[in-house]
């Protein structure tokens, strides 16, 4: 009996055993639950690593493709620039009616016209070629004196005929800054490439000049103009009213006021850069921005008529160079002069008399006529002075008339530049509107906070008691402000997009009406 535990002892011991069992079971359950949670965490972490790696690879692929496209566009731009400058080289074997396909070099700037379009217009005889100009001309010069002077002319101006020289290079604003901008080094690299390209073009032009001089000394190259061709072109030279240089009289004629202009001056005329309208704003269309950019057509340098254009009538007795005979094969033929009716009657009487005199005289007269016809063959495109003097003077032509070459035809990228400038201005306006809207919201928030700060202590106690709700409310307010700013930015972008689309439709309608 003495070894049997008491009632209190039995209860305590049993309770301790049960507690041990409960603690053991709880420990086992806790360990199993922790193990399962670790497994879940490991699985989720592995999934996160895989997903992050996948997204990272996708991001790298997208960025890589974007860089490749950007690099390709840059290469295409550089190739187009190289091709443009190579087409500005004057080559003596690329001539049309005594002129050339590239400018002489009177001007050093504004050579950004489309060379392919201008070359095709010259080859098709729709635009006057680039003739080599004379600094002075005197009608009293003899043919020998004029030929000596023409023989000393070069293909291109002796002075550097291209811009971006060291003395005319534009000063970069970042040159005076300690911290350079992000695009500074890129601009410097592009300037260095352009300078190298221009130096290369100058060397190629010098080689072409030397080749032309050597061929003239040999005096048997058919690509060099003959004496007859030079005299035919420059015997009655005319002065260009803009550059005051003397060219062959076959120049472009303005469509509006019928004034002559050389091709060298014609390609210099261009539209102004996109700018805000400077006229009366009362005629501005509804919904249009007050700082909307426009691009006005080029005006005539003589009469200031809008949408300047020219026409060209090629000489009918000269067809040398491309799609014609060699310039060295050109020979002047005497023009056919119309005979009067009395002369024809006299010839008829003489022929009748000759027929009655005898058979031998008839044979001799026919032989003489055949010999004369063989010695002086009639020119293909020659006309009589009488018909030429009766040519009627034409009036002004419309800009879209057949045969009219406008400034926009040789610079067709003006609309692309205008749209680019408008998009840039729209982005600036949207950014300014977003900043203005955010400043308004911040001002409203500061005013509300200052009004709340003027309250009594009970308000402070309520804020201390409701600190958690206050924090959540502040987060909600900031999110609402950001959402409002974003919404305003989206609305502004949509409004600008709608205005651009309306402007495009108006321009399309105007073009269709024309």
UniProtKB/Swiss-Prot annotation:
List the biased-composition ranges (Acidic residues): 340-349
Q: Which GO terms describe its biological process?
A: cellular response to glucose starvation
Provide the Gene Ontology terms for cellular component: cytoplasm
The entry's localization annotation reads: Cytoplasm
Q: Bias regions of kind Basic and acidic residues — which residues?
A: 64-79
What InterPro entries does the entry give? Answer: Sip5/DA2
Region of interest: Disordered = 1-79, 340-396, 442-481
Query: Which UniProt keywords are listed?
Result: Cytoplasm
Q: Where is the composition biased (Low complexity)?
A: 12-36, 445-481
User: Main role?
Assistant: May negatively regulate the SNF1 kinase.
Family that this chain belongs to: Belongs to the SIP5 family.
The identity of this protein, by name, is Protein SIP5
Q: What is the primary gene name for this protein?
A: SIP5
